[in-house]
Every structure is written in C-alpha cells, then in structure tokens.
A protein has these predicted regions:
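Conserved helix-loop-beta segment at the catalytic/binding core of cyclic-nucleotide signaling proteins
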Residues: 1-19
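TPR-repeat structural position
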Residues: 23, 172-173
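Active-site loop/short helix in cyclic nucleotide turnover domains
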Residues: 13-17, 68-78
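Alpha-helical scaffold within the catalytic cores of cyclic-nucleotide enzymes
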Residues: 15, 19-62, 87-100, 120
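A structural signal for short, well-ordered beta-strand segments
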Residues: 9, 60-66, 138
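Allosteric regulatory "coupling" segments in signal-transduction proteins
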Residues: 23, 80-85, 124
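Cytosolic regulatory/linker segments at or just downstream of nucleotide-handling modules
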Residues: 69, 98-168, 180-187
Length: 187
C-alpha cells in the first residue's frame, strides 16, 4: 500500500522488489478485497440492526493498470514518500472511476490483461481517456481460473464478444439481441 487519499487506496507491485507476476498479484489482491466486502457488509448490517441504525453498505471500485512509472523517494529532505508517478498511474485512477460507469467491480487496462494468467475477463469498451490522444481498451475481471474453465462463462464470453462487435459496428438490434442472450446465459 502506497497511500490513502480520501476514500482511495493506492498500491503498487514490482517495486522495490522485482515481481514477475505483479499483474496477477494486483488482480488477486483486488479479487480478495471484493470477496471480503460481502461478509464485511453483513457484519456492519448486523451491528446497525442491533443498534437500530440505518445500514449503509460499503461499495468499492478498483482500477488496475500496468506500465512504466517513475518510482522512488519523492519529496524533499524534510519530507518524502516512496511512491509512483506517471501516465500509467493516472490511468489506473481513471479506470477505478469507470468501475461505477460500467457497473463492475474491477476494471483493468490492456497492459494488465496482457500479463495476466488464468483470470476470467471480459472486454468492456474502447475508452477515450482525458489527457490521452489514443483510446484505451478496458476490461473487467469476472473471476479466477475456476470461472475461466466453466463452460457457462466461455459461452457468455463468446456472446459478449459478438455483442461488442455489433455495438462497434452500430448494429444496434444485433447488439441488443446478444445482450439479452448474455443475460439469459448468466441466469
């Protein structure tokens, strides 16, 4: 963990110690956080109910990106912090914001996807990010190896790919049909 900024937690992998599986470790940490959220909310709800308070569930969105950054002690002689800076750090923050837009828990960039092993992912969109000249392809993490190996997920992914192709080609009826089919496959 690098720092807490309001309701944001910033963390990074692969520094100061090399970690060849840093993309996997980042995504696995994100998945572990999401897995812990449901029981945590159940605990908070039980406490709120026992005290007669309104229950307000905790919800989080996570953005991960992989890339080249500036890492090291930042600041002055009087005050410094070991941290990371750079475009790829900023993109991770923007991806976190997209989790709410797309209604998913974990959003990752294409560079992170390229380094993952055994994770179930779905492409979300080609997104024009403020401050970038080229759009970036974004994906969501649906689960781990267990989900990736399920026939139901593989069918859903194929339907999802067809839906995205129809959407990109502005074939709206076809895109909606694929979307409906995907919803039925998830049920």
């Amino acid at each position: 963990i690098d720092e807490y900024m309001g309701d944001c937690i910033m963390a990074f992998w692969n520094a100061p110690v090399d970690d060849k599986s840093h993309a996997d470790h980042g995504v696995e940490s994100a998945m572990a956080m999401m897995a812990r959220l449901k029981p945590l909310n159940e605990e908070i709800k039980a406490e709120a109910d026992a005290e007669g308070r309104k229950f307000i569930p905790l919800a989080i969105g996570i953005g991960l990106n992989t890339g080249v950054v500036c890492v090291g002690n930042m600041g002055s002689d009087q005050r410094f912090d070991y941290s990371v800076l750079g475009d790829d750090v900023n993109l991770a923050a923007r991806l976190e914001g997209q989790s709410k837009t797309y209604g998913v828990d974990i959003v990752i960039g294409a560079n992170t996807l390229a380094q993952l092993t055994d994770k179930a992912t779905l492409e979300l969109d080609l997104l024009q990010v403020r401050g970038k000249t080229k759009p970036v392809r974004i994906h969501c993490v649906a689960g781990g190896k267990d989900l990736l190996e399920r026939e139901k997920f593989l069918q859903l992914r194929e339907t999802h790919i067809k839906m995205l192709a129809a959407y990109a080609g502005q074939r709206w009826d076809e895109a909606f049909e694929s979307l409906d089919k995907g919803r039925k496959e998830m049920a």
